[in-house]
């Protein structure tokens, strides 16, 4: 049976993550408050950020910038802005 959490991003009860995917206190906060669906949304945005901004995950500054974007997206409702990207119209 999967665990459920009240997802702060989606503002609803949803399936929680199976295990803590990120280290430290931030990882615990994500595990306790973010659903699988919301984490999937973040992974999509993260991939776009890494590719479009040509981030190097070996660079501590790039990792810190990505972590800041992640916190803003998951907990503060800030959308990820990528210069020159226009989302497809629905």
Curated annotation (Swiss-Prot):
GO biological process, one term: cellular response to oxidative stress
Pfam families listed in its UniProt record: Iron_traffic
Keywords: Iron
A GO CC term attached to the entry: cytosol
GO MF, one annotated term: iron ion binding
InterPro entries assigned to the protein according to its UniProt record, in alphabetical order: Fe_traffick_prot_YggX, Fe_traffick_prot_YggX_sf
Keyword Iron recorded: yes
Signal peptide feature range: none
NCBIfam families in the cross-refs: PRK05408.1
Functional description taken from the UniProt entry: Could be a mediator in iron transactions between iron acquisition and iron-requiring processes, such as synthesis and/or repair of Fe-S clusters in biosynthetic enzymes.
Family: Belongs to the Fe(2+)-trafficking protein family.
Protein name: Probable Fe(2+)-trafficking protein
Organism: Aliivibrio salmonicida (strain LFI1238) (Vibrio salmonicida (strain LFI1238))
